[in-house]
């Protein structure tokens, strides 16, 4: 599930079972794996791959 306030670049690959929280930003060339949870206010950019079954906590910033 992708929260309605999340911003997802069209070039990002998000598996259907992943969850993206409110106000998170997912940039191009980012991959979010199966059953991963991205909490609120997270920023993920660059050539970044988050594997399956991961949890990224609120206000984290990952990538370039």
Task: Enumerate the predicted regions with their spans.
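A structural motif detector for beta-strand N-caps
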Residues: 6, 12, 17-20, 24, ...
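Acidic/polar low-complexity surface segments
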Residues: 63-64
């Amino acid at each position: 599930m992708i929260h309605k306030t999340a911003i997802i670049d069209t070039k990002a690959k998000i598996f259907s079972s992943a969850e993206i929280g409110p106000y998170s930003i997912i940039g191009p060339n980012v991959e979010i794996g199966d059953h991963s949870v991205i909490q609120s206010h997270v920023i993920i950019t660059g050539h970044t791959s988050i594997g399956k079954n991961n949890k990224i906590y609120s206000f984290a910033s990952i990538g370039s």
